[in-house]
Amino acid sequence: MWDRVEEQGVGSLRSHTHGRHVPHVSYAVLRRWEQAAVTDALAAIGGGDPVELSFDGVGLFRRGRTWLLAGVSSDFVTRQQRVVEVVTATGAELHKHYRPGIWLPHCSLAPRATLVQLPVVAAAVMDVLPLRGRLDRAALVNSATGEISPLAELP
């Protein structure tokens, strides 16, 4: 999907910042955290089965952040709530948009699309949707550097 967006001259998450992004759905974004404590807390909740998602729409956050909207099960929402609960219990500071009840499960497309580019992004992806995805692994990712620390199990 990122290729389709980039082919239309719109920067996708692939070419954003450090260029090490991979397609993903985030349970949480932490503004401050202690990695060892967060890793241990997530390990303590045990592993879950892979998650099947269906992306069937394009969404828009402020400042031109376009994304694919995922239809999710109540189990997936419960997992996100559990992840937030255990990581914030370590003292980690959660980004306000990832609070349970506010969180919108999504996969980012273009992080800085202009108003003129929004219909271009939508046209690039609408004929491909729905897009099915399987989440079968998880990691802690430092989005500033792109450093990825895989987790042993999918929370």
Which residue stretches match the model-derived regions?
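A short glycine-rich, hydrophobically flanked beta-strand micro-motif that places a catalytic Asp/Glu
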Residues: 53-57
